[in-house]
Amino acid sequence: MMWTISIILAAMCFGGIVDVTGVMGTVAQGLLKVAKGRGGLVLATELMCLITNAVCCDQYLALVLPGRMFKEKFEDMKLRPENLSRALEDCGTITSNFFPWNTCGATMRNFLNVDSSYIPYAILNWLNPIVSVFFGYTGITMTKLTDEEYAAILEEREAEKQAALKSLEA
């Protein structure tokens, strides 16, 4: 049990370092350059979740980091926050057990005494991200922000920007 807890602590520390240094942001910017349209954005979000699961070794980081990185892009495409949340869940959560060094994979292997040979048979875990990307490209279940909601988001961003500038001056 201590081994699993130590992996979680190390993953959180590593995730913080990767976030603060901007490494994951650089990867996200590269993905965003090729993400054209709604479907490309969903695909980029899911790829970022997979990369984060593999690199940062923690499912929670695979939800939080890509969520923060892609939030504004989803808003700028006038997609409701539920769309981002679903993309994160459809790939970030459900694929974390594919990586034996990830906290979910390590916990599963320790508690259930199961090795990685089950992965080809985890059909839901493979199929769910594919269906999510399909929904992104076709627009099925992808809800949009109204113009009023988007205007409110832009006002909130500006207020946050002004507050940050004010705190720098102090």
Where are these regions (language model features)?
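Alpha-helical transmembrane segments of multi-pass membrane proteins
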Residues: 40-53, 77-98, 119-128
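Re-entrant/interfacial helical elements at transmembrane boundaries that shape
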Residues: 27, 60-73, 102-113
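Core transmembrane alpha-helical segments of multi-pass membrane transporters/permeases
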Residues: 1-25, 42, 46, 50-51, ...
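Transmembrane helix-loop junctions in multipass membrane proteins, especially transporters and channels
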Residues: 20, 24, 58-61, 137-148
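Hydrophobic alpha-helical segments of integral membrane proteins
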Residues: 23-35, 66, 73, 91
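Membrane-interfacial loop-to-helix junctions in multi-pass transporters
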Residues: 1-5, 21, 30-46, 77-84, ...
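Juxtamembrane and boundary regions of transmembrane helices in multi-pass small-molecule transporters
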Residues: 76, 106-170
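Hydrophobic alpha-helical transmembrane segments of multi-pass integral membrane proteins
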Residues: 11, 31-69
